[in-house]
Amino acid sequence: MCIRDSYGSVGKNDQGTPLLSDAFRAAAELSEADVFIYCNCDVILLKNLLSSLEFVLASEKVDSFVAFGRRIDLDVTNEIDFANPQAVAKLLDDVKKNGKLAPVVCKEYFAFTRDQFRSIPDFVVGRGNWDNWMLAHAKSIGLPVIDFTELVKVVHQSHDYSHMQTSRLNVYVSGQEAKQNQKLAGGRNVIGGSTGTWSLTSEGLSKDRMSWVNKKFWMDLPRFLQMVLRFPFQK
């Protein structure tokens, strides 16, 4: 469903940037779906995202939840015919051979039951900190936070950042809108907003040991820092 076609333009801030709060509200008003998905537009979603959500919904282990996943960065240079099984198989093979899993802080989508996130702060789209808030807030209210990364492969089509009028550092971290998002989020929530409390793998759905979750974050910290250090030079 396209909110723009069914609902019209969502609310914007003074700089004309869309508000996530209005988009989430519009989605809840327009759809009676059990689960809503927010996803960045530069990724390729494969069918096992939906089958994974169906598995969790049928599980007796959790009721309400929020699921998330990291992306796999890949240079996609040719158009893909998803109606052709061979083309999809080739993509998956390319992902396996050449794809690079993004750092632990890079969440590419959120899927949550309709009873959650009905009212959120007025975060703006495309700036930092709101995504960390989603997971940190869920944890603060005891909502299961499920990491789909190991099972669900989400392909991020590598691109430049020429659409930005400034650096990635300004857009995501130091700019006015990023700082406003940070204020609304009550901080950056980097650790709590980048890890789950449950994991979905080929072996099923299981609750994580917090010691392992924290270890996973700290083990990936060097890659996160390398990414941030590149921000001032990426336009």
What are these regions (language model features)?
Residues R4-C39, L46:
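Active-site-proximal specificity loops/subdomain of glycosyltransferases
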Residues S6-G8, V66, V145-D147:
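Conserved beta-strand scaffold positions in the cores of enzyme catalytic domains, especially
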Residues K12, D42-I44, I72-D75, F117, ...:
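Short, solvent-exposed loop/turn segments at secondary-structure junctions
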Residues S21, Y38, A102-V105, V154:
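Preference for well-ordered, secondary-structure-rich cores of eukaryotic proteins
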Residues E32-A33, K61-F65, L143:
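Short, high-confidence coil segments that cap the C-terminus of an alpha-helix
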Residues I44-A136:
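Conserved catalytic core of nucleotide-sugar-dependent glycosyltransferases
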Residues F123-K235:
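C-terminal catalytic/acceptor-binding lobe
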